Amino acid sequence: MILIDGKSLSKDLKERLATQVQEYKHHTAITPKLVAIIVGNDPASKTYVASKEKACAQVGIDSQVITLPEHTTESELLELIDQLNNDSSVHAILVQLPLPAHINKNNVIYSIKPEKDVDGFHPTNVGRLQLRDKKCLESCTPKGIMTMLREYGIKTEGAYAVVVGASNVVGKPVSQLLLNAKATVTTCHRFTTDLKSHTTKADILIVAVGKPNFITADMVKEGAVVIDVGINHVDGKIVGDVDFAAVKDKVAAITPVPGGVGPMTITELLYNTFQCAQELNR
């Protein structure tokens, strides 16, 4: 069994990116810049953004965090985003979710200039993903999953891939990326009947449902590759959506939780920020 070590791979990829960013800055005198916006005082959001700030510094990308009070209105937030859209020194914009209930998430996502939409959530980038447009900014977690498969030499062409979970953030975009990579793809969701009949056929099984130890050994094919996107807190520990202990001896490769997909998400955010800077300054 191969352990797909996202933490180690992420470190290698950041070292590669740091070299690219340094060369880019030397040749263009432009420093890629990411601006992250937090609305309110959610501790998890602050932790996530702090880790993104730290990662930016590691590769030579500038970052700025703007923290707005909980009572910030939607129009005030949209006005700030408009200013950042028109600021040529800002290449990538991230609005940390969740937002307070009085702010419409979609209105905020749609207001970000597609070329600065570092999370890849804007409808333009969703459409570009479908069309395999090279200018597409791919959603960070799905992009990280595909990078893991590629870097570990896991063949997608002709493979049967099953994605459990159909969210706009992970399930749908990773299904499309797998399809673009010439896999045959089935996307399962809460209305899927007889889930096990699908998962036991999967050469590549990707799970993103937010339910601890949801996928058990009897639901996985011998020799499959399993990517666990879940992050769940159980008895003070972080566990995935896959019963790792039961499944690991049955599969060819599997990601751990923590230390699997999570680190790759932040690394791909850095790569997307660099892509934004390059595209905006062509």
UniProtKB/Swiss-Prot annotation:
Source domain of life is Bacteria
Enumerate the residues binding NADP(+).
Answer: 165-167, 231
Q: Keywords in UniProt for this one? A: Amino-acid biosynthesis, Histidine biosynthesis, Hydrolase, Methionine biosynthesis, Multifunctional enzyme, NADP, One-carbon metabolism, Oxidoreductase, Purine biosynthesis
Q: Does the keyword Ligase apply?
A: no
CDD domains xrefs: NAD_bind_m-THF_DH_Cyclohyd (cd01080)
Q: What is its EC number?
A: 1.5.1.5, 3.5.4.9
Question: Which transformation does this protein catalyse, written as a reaction?
Answer: (6R)-5,10-methylene-5,6,7,8-tetrahydrofolate + NADP(+) = (6R)-5,10-methenyltetrahydrofolate + NADPH; (6R)-5,10-methenyltetrahydrofolate + H2O = (6R)-10-formyltetrahydrofolate + H(+)
Q: Does the keyword Mitochondrion apply?
A: no
Which Gene3D superfamilies does this chain map to?
A: Leucine Dehydrogenase, chain A, domain 1 (3.40.50.10860), NAD(P)-binding Rossmann-like Domain (3.40.50.720)
Q: What InterPro entries does UniProt report for this protein, alphabetically?
A: Aminoacid_DH-like_N_sf, NAD(P)-bd_dom_sf, THF_DH/CycHdrlase, THF_DH/CycHdrlase_cat_dom, THF_DH/CycHdrlase_CS, THF_DH/CycHdrlase_NAD-bd_dom
**A GO term from the CC aspect:** cytosol
Q: Name one GO biological process term.
A: tetrahydrofolate interconversion
Pfam families (UniProt xref): THF_DHG_CYH, THF_DHG_CYH_C
Subunit comment: Homodimer.
So what does this one do?
Catalyzes the oxidation of 5,10-methylenetetrahydrofolate to 5,10-methenyltetrahydrofolate and then the hydrolysis of 5,10-methenyltetrahydrofolate to 10-formyltetrahydrofolate.
Protein family (similarity comment)? Belongs to the tetrahydrofolate dehydrogenase/cyclohydrolase family.
Query: PANTHER family, alphabetically?
Result: C-1-TETRAHYDROFOLATE SYNTHASE, CYTOPLASMIC, C-1-TETRAHYDROFOLATE SYNTHASE, CYTOPLASMIC-RELATED
Q: What's this protein's name? A: Bifunctional protein FolD
Organism for this UniProt entry: Francisella tularensis subsp. tularensis (strain SCHU S4 / Schu 4)
Name of the gene = folD
